[in-house]
Amino acid sequence: TAESAALSNCVACIWLERMRAKTVIGMANIDVFTGRSSVFETETELMHAPTTYDELERFISAHAPSEVIIITDNFSQREVEDLLNFAGIATCARLVHRLESGNDAVQRAKKQVYQREIMARFFGPAMGSVGSGLMQFATHEFATQALTYLLNFVHEHNPHLVHRIAEPAFENCSDRMVLANHSL
């Protein structure tokens, strides 16, 4: 609703890429008031339909970000407009930044050296070193890219908003059962 968008302290970054026979979606969210952050990544079949973006819709409805950065690769403007509506971003976000994968800052967020630097800057040296701290980041490449871009974006706009940010909670879990309208 419009009221929940006005009350949200969340900023999200959605990273979408089409590759081979699938669409990969990496998502990152920061609550700038509490410092909580979360990431999620999903793969879906390569088709442009509302059900393709169900997990994105779940993520958006759970966090209701008032500002969203959407980074796309191999998506047309029309498809981006559609997914903003499919996922409910158009109704909850007051501000949507749309970026293509060719953007310099986006290209930088793809580089592992830069990702480690950002993780170390915001979460301490242990998160920036190779080891257990980076294990989940390594297995969720697009969620990591989304978080890297989002951390830098928020820091550039107001460094105090990410001064005491907590390590991100990975919302990827396999113990959820998904029921769609046609499954009952």
Give names to the regions the model predicted.
Residues 1-184:
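Charged catalytic and DNA/RNA-contacting regions of genome-maintenance
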